[in-house]
Regions:
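Long, positively charged amphipathic alpha-helical accessory segments at protein N-termini or as interdomain linkers
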Residues: 101-107, 111-129, 139-295
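Short loop/edge segments at beta-strand edges and connector loops
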Residues: 44, 131-133
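Short, ordered beta-strand-loop transition motifs
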Residues: 7-9, 132, 254
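N-terminal lobe of the biotin/lipoate ligase/transferase fold
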Residues: 1-122, 143, 195, 292-295
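Conserved active-site carboxylates
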Residues: 136
Length: 295
């Protein structure tokens, strides 16, 4: 797809419209990120950008390699769910990272990605967003973005991490399947204005690069503090579905590895490393945690 150009007699030419298709040269900031964008792989169609990034990482792709696709035929969500990925309307991207950290700290990079997405939405588009643990970015309670991180590691070190990000930018109502598990939206549906996908990608990669540099230099605490400022769980009673059953309690923050903490009526907070928040309600007063299922 080419650029639309008008010829003006005795003057020259002017650009009327740029193509909607993404261009690998236009998705990175003018000031190249320090770590992200060492390689950019732009695909017209793929099954999953995470699968592509994983393959590249195993083949030795350098840290900061980016995969970005116009559409996915099998976009991946958490727990085997499918990320709906129509062509030419959203952002589907995965990034290869090789942080010198133990596996226990890897969840912090999922939180970092959520913070970067929320910042772009608010600061570039003027929309208040929030983050739902562990990986959803919401607008007015509806999911607008998700993050899926996958890791190759040994007991004491990470070989590489693939951070996949999907952001609903220009989807219309009819593009969403009717049987979605959770309500979803797009920036277009919220604002009524079409989003420049390349511009969104440039801003996101720049913010991801800065946050990643902060994480490597200062550890996870700045990431955790930023995530808590964006989270939608403050003063909420949560019900969380885990592999061992359901746990409920008052949101008590995150630990230093990004695990969810639920207050337990005076005892040490319950620590949840993986699960889905399936219910949330305002809590005027403390209630004890109830646990269903094994430990």
């Amino acid at each position: 797809m080419g650029y639309a150009i008008d010829g003006i007699p005795s003057t020259g030419y002017r650009l009327v419209a740029a193509p909607d298709a993404l261009d690998a040269d236009e998705v990175l900031p003018d000031t190249r990120p320090e770590r992200l964008g060492t390689r950019v792989h732009l695909l017209a169609e793929t099954r999953s950008t995470n699968d592509d990034a994983w393959r590249l990482a195993r083949e030795g792709a350098p840290e900061g390699s980016i995969v970005i696709a116009e559409c996915q035929t099998g976009g991946k969500g958490r727990k085997g769910r499918v990320w709906v990925s129509p062509k030419g309307v959203n952002l589907y991207t995965s990034i290869v990272l090789r942080p010198p950290i133990p596996p226990s700290q890897a969840p912090l990079l999922t939180l970092l990605a959520g913070v970067a997405v929320a910042e772009v939405i608010r600061e570039d588009h003027g929309i208040e967003a929030g983050i739902k643990w562990p990986n959803d970015v919401l607008i007015d309670g509806k999911k607008v973005a998700g993050i899926l991180s996958e890791m190759s590691a040994e007991a004491d070190r990470v070989h590489f991490l693939v951070v996949g990000i999907g952001v609903n930018l220009n989807m219309t109502e009819e593009m969403f399947p009717p049987d979605l598990l959770h309500p979803a939206t797009s920036l277009f549906l919220v604002t009524g204005t079409k989003v420049d996908r390349a511009s969104f990608a440039r801003s996101l990669y720049g913010r991801l690069d800065r946050w990643y540099a902060t994480f490597l230099a200062r550890g996870g605490e700045p990431v955790r503090e930023a995530w808590l400022a964006w989270c939608v769980h403050r003063d909420r009673w949560l019900e969380v579905l885990t592999l061992s059953g359901r746990q409920s309690g008052r949101f008590a923050g995150l630990d230093d590895e990004g695990c969810l903490l639920l207050e337990s009526g005076g005892a040490a907070p319950a620590r949840i490393s993986a699960g889905d928040v399936v219910r949330s309600r305002q809590m005027p007063s403390a209630e004890p945690v109830s646990n269903e299922g094994g430990g």
